[in-house]
C-alpha cells in the first residue's frame, strides 16, 4: 500500500522575535500562510526494519540529517514499529529558502505514517512529534492562515485571506536558519506588530494587512546578502502591494491584489533571478 501526501510551502506574513528563552531558543510570534507550491511525499512499507529515502532532487541529504528521516525515526521508536518504510520525495519547493520545505515534508511524513500504520494520533500528538523536529513543523501539520506562538508549538487558526496573487523570487544561494538566529541581538532587532497584523486579517482589511507585514530577521539576512533588498525594491517598483523576505530567507515574496500586477512583477523578476514563481494562497 502507498500513501500520498501533498506538502505545501509556507510564507511568513509576519515574524517577530519576542526574546530569547532560557534554553537558548527564541520566543516567536508569527502569522503564516500556505501557498500552492508543493512537494509530494509517497510512503510505502518495507519488510526490512529500516528507513529508506529517495528523491528527484540532489540538493538535500537522504540520510538521518533529513527532517523526513527524523520524523519516521521518532514515530518508529515512539510506537515500537519494527517494520521499515520507503519515503519518496518529489521536490518543487526550493531548499534552504525560508519556505519551510523540510518542515512541510516532515509534517507530510507524520500524517502519512499515521495513516499507514493506523496509529490514530490526534493533532496534539502529531504536533508533539513535529516540534521535536523543528519549530515550523507544528504549523505545517495543518497549514492555512495561522497565528504561531511560543517556539512554534502553539498554532491558532485565523480566517482565510481574500484571494490574491503572490510572486516568489529565490536568489541562487541558500540560507542556514541556525546561522541567522545565532546573530540575533534581541535588544536591537526590528520588531513587528503581530497584533496589528492579526487585527487586519480578522477585519479583512487588505490595505492594513500589507502595511503591517514585517520580518524581524530581514535586516540580519540583508546585511549578509544585500541582493535581497534589491529584489524587494524591484518588486515594489513593478507594482507589488508589498515585498517581504519569508522566514530566514533568502526568498522574497510580493503580494498583489490583481493578477495583472502579479504578471508585471513576475516579468520584471524573470530575467533577474533564475527561480521565480507565480502562486496563489491555499484556501
From Swiss-Prot:
Q: What is its EC number?
A: 2.7.1.148
Active-site residues, record numbering mapped to chain: 10, 136
The record, for SUPFAM superfamilies, names: GHMP Kinase, C-terminal domain (SSF55060), Ribosomal protein S5 domain 2-like (SSF54211)
Q: Show the Pfam families listed in the entry.
A: GHMP_kinases_C, GHMP_kinases_N
The record's section on InterPro entries has:
GHMP_kinase_C_dom, GHMP_kinase_C_sf, GHMP_kinase_N_dom, IspE, Ribosomal_Su5_D2-typ_SF, Ribsml_uS5_D2-typ_fold_subgr
Record key words, sorted:
ATP-binding, Kinase, Nucleotide-binding, Transferase
Instruction: List, in alphabetical order, the GO biological process terms annotated in this UniProt record.
Output: terpenoid biosynthetic process
Q: Does the keyword Transferase apply?
A: yes
Q: Which GO terms describe its molecular function?
A: 4-(cytidine 5'-diphospho)-2-C-methyl-D-erythritol kinase activity; ATP binding
Summarize where ATP binds, as residue positions.
Answer: 94-104
Reactions catalysed, as given in the entry: 4-CDP-2-C-methyl-D-erythritol + ATP = 4-CDP-2-C-methyl-D-erythritol 2-phosphate + ADP + H(+)
Q: What role is this protein assigned?
A: Catalyzes the phosphorylation of the position 2 hydroxy group of 4-diphosphocytidyl-2C-methyl-D-erythritol.
Tell me the protein family, please: Belongs to the GHMP kinase family. IspE subfamily.
Q: Which HAMAP family match?
A: IspE
What protein name applies here? Putative 4-diphosphocytidyl-2-C-methyl-D-erythritol kinase
This chain's source organism reads Streptococcus agalactiae serotype V (strain ATCC BAA-611 / 2603 V/R)
Amino acid at each position: 500500500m502507498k500513501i500520498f501526501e501533498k506538502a505545501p510551502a509556507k510564507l511568513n506574513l509576519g515574524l517577530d522575535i519576542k526574546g530569547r528563552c532560557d534554553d537558548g531558543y527564541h520566543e516567536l510570534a508569527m502569522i503564516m500562510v500556505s501557498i500552492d507550491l508543493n512537494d509530494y511525499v509517497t510512503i510505502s512499507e518495507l519488510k526490512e526494519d529500516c528507513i529508506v529515502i529517495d528523491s528527484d532532487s540532489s540538493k538535500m541529504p537522504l540520510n538521518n540529517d533529513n527532517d523526513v528521516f527524523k520524523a519516521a525515526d521518532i514515530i518508529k521508536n515512539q510506537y515500537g514499529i519494527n517494520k521499515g518504510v520507503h519515503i519518496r520525495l518529489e521536490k518543487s519547493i526550493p531548499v534552504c529558502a525560508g519556505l519551510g520545505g523540510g518542515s512541510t515534508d516532515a509534517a507530510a511524513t507524520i500524517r502519512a505514517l499515521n495513516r499507514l500504520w493506523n496509529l490514530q494520533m490526534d493533532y496534539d500528538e502529531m504536533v508533539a512529534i513535529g516540534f521535536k523536529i523543528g519549530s515550523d513543523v507544528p504549523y505545517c501539520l495543518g497549514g492555512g492562515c495561522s497565528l504561531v506562538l511560543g517556539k512554534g508549538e502553539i498554532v491558532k487558526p485565523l480566517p482565510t485571506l481574500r484571494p490574491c496573487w503572490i510572486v516568489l523570487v529565490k536568489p541562487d544561494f541558500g540560507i542556514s536558519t541556525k546561522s541567522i538566529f545565532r546573530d540575533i541581538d534581541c535588544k536591537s532587532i526590528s520588531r513587528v506588530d503581530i497584533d496589528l497584523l492579526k487585527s487586519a486579517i480578522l477585519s479583512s482589511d487588505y490595505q492594513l494587512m500589507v502595511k503591517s507585514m514585517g520580518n524581524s530577521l530581514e535586516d540580519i539576512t540583508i546585511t549578509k546578502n544585500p541582493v535581497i533588498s534589491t529584489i524587494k525594491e524591484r518588486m515594489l517598483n513593478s507594482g507589488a502591494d508589498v515585498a517581504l523576505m519569508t522566514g530566514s530567507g533568502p526568498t522574497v515574496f510580493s503580494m498583489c491584489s490583481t493578477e495583472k500586477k502579479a504578471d508585471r512583477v513576475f516579468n520584471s523578476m524573470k530575467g533577474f533571478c533564475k527561480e521565480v514563481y507565480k502562486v496563489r494562497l491555499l484556501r
